[in-house]
Swiss-Prot record:
The active site is at 91 (glycyl thioester intermediate). This is Ubiquitin-conjugating enzyme E2 W. GO terms for molecular function: ATP binding; ubiquitin conjugating enzyme activity; ubiquitin-protein transferase activity. CDD domains: UBCc_UBE2W.
Length: 151
């Protein structure tokens, strides 16, 4: 538990001092608990999401960094994207099976920025309605099927 807290403190400072472009730690979100953060995000310039504002929710288990954080979009504005479900769940392999303790909150943020920035068409995943109706609240409990860089 102490190593998890030490690691989160280090990552918290890194996110406060050197946030990825368009990302800001929501300071209020960490006042009560170091294991749940909200990161405010703005769509990158020159992309389909330019000027749009989103929020990412990070939840860390006591096994972090050996266990990936639970990461999902939250709030009123969930991006319309082929890998983002309308409930905020994100289909991104580094959030599950490709997670490594060498990754960090910053690297997850950069991957999500890159995923949104490379989008050519705003649309939901083809199985959005079914998935949202039947999924677990925790996206990490989903058995994602990654193929051809899509879900």
């Amino acid at each position: 538990m102490a190593s998890m807290q030490k690691r989160l403190q280090k990552e918290l400072l890194a996110l406060q001092n050197e946030p990825p472009p368009g990302m800001t730690l929501n300071e209020k979100s960490v006042q009560n608990s170091i294991t749940q953060w909200i990161v405010d995000m703005e769509g990158a310039p020159g992309t389909l999401y330019e000027g749009e504002k989103f929020q990412l929710l990070f939840k860390f288990s006591s096994r972090y960094p050996f266990d990936s954080p639970q990461v999902m979009f939250t709030g009123d504005n969930i991006p319309v994207h082929p890998h983002v479900y309308s409930n905020g769940h994100i289909c991104l392999s580094i959030l599950t099976e490709d997670w490594s303790p060498a990754l960090s909150v910053q690297s997850v943020c950069l991957s999500i920025i890159s995923m949104l920035s490379s989008c050519k068409e705003k649309r939901r995943p083809p199985d959005n309605s079914f998935y949202v109706r039947t999924c677990n609240k925790n996206p990490k409990k989903t058995k994602w099927w990654y193929h051809d860089d899509t879900c």
